[in-house]
C-alpha cells in the first residue's frame, strides 16, 4: 500500500554535542499525511534533530532515510528564515518555486501560474497587501509567514519546520498549522514541526516525539 510506505525514516539515530549525547537509539518513520510534532525542553536537541533529518548534520550513530520522490524531497523552515531583505515580499515567495523551473523559464519572470499560486498563498497568510513591500519593512510575524509561503511554493514532499509559528498569535498559529497540514496532505507528503504549545500539538499533530534533556535515551514517540 503506497500510503503506508514511509517517506522519512530514522533508525538508531544518535547525536553527540561536545561530550554529551543529545539523544541515542532514536527511531521513527513517517508516511504520507503524517504530522510529527517534536517537543522537549530547551537544549534537548530539537533543532539539531531537524538538521540531521535534512542531511545538513551528520549523525554520530544510526541513519536517516528520505524516501520521498520528486524534485524537492525535503523543504525546511528554520528560525533564521533566510529571506532576502533587499527583495520585495512577492519575490521572496516566488523564489521558492525556482527549483521546479529551468533558468531560461524564469529569465524573463515567473510563469503566470506560479504568480497566481504565490498570490493565493500570500492571501491565505494575511500578506495579500504586502507583496510589493520590501521584505526588510515587514514585522517578524509577517516575515515568518512569508518564509512559510516560500517553502510551500517549493512543494516539498517532506517539510521540516523549526518553530514555524513562534512569532504568531494563537489564531494565526492555528491557521498556519492548518495550512501546512492541508498543503502536505494535497501533495501526499509529511510534516515535521518543532512546537511548544501543547494545545497546538493535540489539535494538529498525528504523532509526537518528545526529547529529554536529562537522558539521551529518554525520548518517547506516540500517536496523538
Describe the residue ranges of each PLM region.
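H-loop/switch region of ABC-family ATPase nucleotide-binding domains
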Residues: 195-196
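Conserved ABC ATPase "signature" region
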Residues: 106-130
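Conserved ABC ATPase signature
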Residues: 134-138, 142
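Catalytic Walker B motif of ABC-type/P-loop ATPase nucleotide-binding domains
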Residues: 159-162
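Conserved structural motif at the start of ABC-family nucleotide-binding domains
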Residues: 8, 22-25
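Q-loop/switch helix immediately C-terminal to the Walker
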Residues: 86-105
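Helix-to-loop junction immediately C-terminal to a conserved catalytic motif
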Residues: 54
Amino acid at each position: 500500500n503506497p500510503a503506508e510506505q514511509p517517506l522519512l525514516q530514522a533508525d538508531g539515530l544518535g547525536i553527540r554535542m561536545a561530550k554529551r549525547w543529545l539523544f541515542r537509539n532514536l527511531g521513527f518513520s513517517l508516511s504520507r499525511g503524517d504530522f510529527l510534532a517534536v517537543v522537549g525542553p530547551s537544549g534537548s536537541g530539537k533543532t539539531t534533530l531537524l538538521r540531521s533529518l535534512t542531511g545538513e548534520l551528520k549523525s554520530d550513530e544510526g541513519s536517516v532515510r528520505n524516501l520521498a520522490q520528486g524534485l524537492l524531497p525535503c523543504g525546511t523552515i528554520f528560525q533564521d528564515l533566510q529571506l532576502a531583505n533587499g527583495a520585495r515580499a512577492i519575490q521572496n515567495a516566488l523564489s521558492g518555486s525556482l527549483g521546479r523551473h529551468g533558468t531560461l523559464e524564469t529569465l524573463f519572470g515567473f510563469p503566470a501560474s506560479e504568480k497566481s499560486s504565490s498570490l493565493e498563498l500570500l492571501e491565505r497568510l494575511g500578506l495579500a497587501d504586502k507583496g510589493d513591500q520590501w521584505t526588510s519593512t515587514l514585522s517578524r510575524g509577517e516575515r515568518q509567514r512569508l518564509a512559510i509561503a516560500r517553502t510551500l511554493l517549493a512543494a516539498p514532499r517532506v517539510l521540516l519546520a523549526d518553530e514555524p509559528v513562534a512569532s504568531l498569535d494563537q489564531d494565526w498559529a492555528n491557521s498556519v498549522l492548518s495550512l501546512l497540514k492541508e498543503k502536505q496532505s494535497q501533495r501526499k507528503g509529511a510534516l515535521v514541526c518543532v512546537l511548544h504549545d501543547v494545545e497546538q500539538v493535540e489539535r494538529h499533530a498525528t504523532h509526537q516525539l518528545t526529547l529529554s534533556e536529562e537522558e539521551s535515551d529518554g525520548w518517547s514517540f506516540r500517536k496523538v
